[in-house]
């Protein structure tokens, strides 16, 4: 009986190669760092306290203008226990989707391949076989990444060539991989567009690059990630609507009762900073009923319904973003 139960469990974890659909998840992990000082990257807040005692470290923290970030740099104890709790909570969040996680996971705010591999090792028992992260030039050292039950091929980064007034600003590239599903090549783009501290035009130019990448080939494509587009800007400029000549946009196709993936405290608004795009007319489409914002009792504040960001002191919470999930059909 035990062997039969184990066999059935393993079958659930392995993607059905003859299926006509697969699931996908986007999750901004909110500062998934290891405990080591990654040379050349600004990871000084995410170190153990014992590594924060030097004059140089303390002085560099005092140069941070935002008080909350300055206090984090000085006093956050990002030790092994804290890191392991963060990883465990992320795994719990990921596998809460249908009991074993989505077939493909797109992640943002991952420091490096070292911490990604640690997360992958914890997810490997659930049938995941591959992970990808390519180091970008973001000064904070946070990158986009994938973990997948499918082999991923041809990983590459695409940088935005911004207008002259923005070209000196730091940005993150678009990460592209390909999978072969039912003998069909599918390209997947993972994005983390410039934050709302930057001009909206930088995000619009990032959307334009994504569109250029999409029309440069005829493969079925998915784009997902943290687009950093708040509802105020989207309403004023119709940014998501303007993508619909090329893409189906998840929260405009389904998830009608969803508030958003992120609560923007400054504007006091729910926003779909995170969403999923599926290419039009290229043989794939959303299962519209599957589109959802993944909320659980441990990733949500009970009183407000907002995302429960990870608290290093209590070791509770996951991220300040909710995951976005959907099932993709071949048609």
Provide a role label for each language-model segment.
Residues 23, 212-222, 229-331:
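Metal-dependent phosphoester-hydrolase catalytic domains
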Residues 24-29, 73-79, 83, 90, ...:
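Active-site beta-strand/loop signature of hydrolases that rely on acidic residues for catalysis
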Residues 73-83, 101-107, 133-134, 163-165, ...:
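Second-shell loop/turn segments in exported
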Residues 17-122, 136, 310, 331:
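N-terminal, active-site-proximal structural segment of metallo-dependent hydrolase catalytic domains
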Residues 41-43, 105, 131-133, 163-164, ...:
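Extracytoplasmic, non-cytosolic globular domains
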Residues 104-106, 110-185:
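Structured beta-strand-rich core segments of catalytic domains in phosphoester-bond hydrolases
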Residues 29-33, 110-114, 136-140, 151-153, ...:
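Solvent-exposed loop/turn segments at secondary-structure junctions
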Residues 1-19:
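Classical Sec-dependent N-terminal signal peptides that target proteins to the secretory pathway
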């Amino acid at each position: 009986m035990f062997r039969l139960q184990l066999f059935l469990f393993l079958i659930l974890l392995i993607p059905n190669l003859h299926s006509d659909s697969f699931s996908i998840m986007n999750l901004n992990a909110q500062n998934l760092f290891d405990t080591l000082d990654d040379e050349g990257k600004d990871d000084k807040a995410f170190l153990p306290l014992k590594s924060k005692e030097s004059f140089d470290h303390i002085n560099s923290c005092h140069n941070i203008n935002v008080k909350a970030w300055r206090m984090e740099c000085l006093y956050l104890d990002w030790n092994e226990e804290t890191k392991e709790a963060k990883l465990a909570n992320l795994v719990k969040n990921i596998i809460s989707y249908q009991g074993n996680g989505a077939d493909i996971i797109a992640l943002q705010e991952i420091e490096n391949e070292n911490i990604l591999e640690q997360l992958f090792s914890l997810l490997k028992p659930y049938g995941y076989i591959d992970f990808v992260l390519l180091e970008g030039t973001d000064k904070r050292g946070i990158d986009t990444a994938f973990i997948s039950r499918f082999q991923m091929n041809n990983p590459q980064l695409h940088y935005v060539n911004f207008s002259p007034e923005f070209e000196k600003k730091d940005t993150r590239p678009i990460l592209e991989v390909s999978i072969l599903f039912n003998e069909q090549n599918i390209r997947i783009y993972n994005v983390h567009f410039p934050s709302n501290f930057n001009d909206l035009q930088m995000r619009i130019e990032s959307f334009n690059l994504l569109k250029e990448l999409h029309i440069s080939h005829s493969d079925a494509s998915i784009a997902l990630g943290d687009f950093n587009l708040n509802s105020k800007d989207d309403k004023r400029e119709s940014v998501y609507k303007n993508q619909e000549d090329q893409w189906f946009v998840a929260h405009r196709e389904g998830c009608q009762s969803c508030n958003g993936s992120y609560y923007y405290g400054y504007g006091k608004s729910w926003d779909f900073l995170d969403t999923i795009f599926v290419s039009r007319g290229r043989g794939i489409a959303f299962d519209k009923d599957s589109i959802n914002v993944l909320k659980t009792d441990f990733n949500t504040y009970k009183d407000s319904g907002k995302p429960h960001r990870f608290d290093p002191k209590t070791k509770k919470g996951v991220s300040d973003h909710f995951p976005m999930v959907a099932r993709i059909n071949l048609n």
